[in-house]
Amino acid sequence: AVERPRQDGQVHEPPGRERKAGCKNFFWKTFTSC
């Protein structure tokens, strides 16, 4: 769950919290950018 596409990103992690700060969290956590 490190290098996942954005569509897979919201699957391995709860869309509730990652949805709000997802753009920022996903950016540095994974390589996904909103």
Swiss-Prot record:
Pfam families: Somatostatin. One of its GO terms (biological process) is regulation of cell migration. GO terms for molecular function: hormone activity. The keyword Secreted applies. Residues 1-20 are annotated as: Disordered. Disulfide bonds join C23-C34. It is found in: Secreted. GO terms for cellular component: extracellular space. InterPro entries: Somatostatin, Somatostatin/Cortistatin_C. It comes from the Eukaryota. Keywords: Cleavage on pair of basic residues, Disulfide bond, Hormone, Secreted. Belongs to the somatostatin family. Somatostatin inhibits the release of somatotropin. This is Somatostatin.
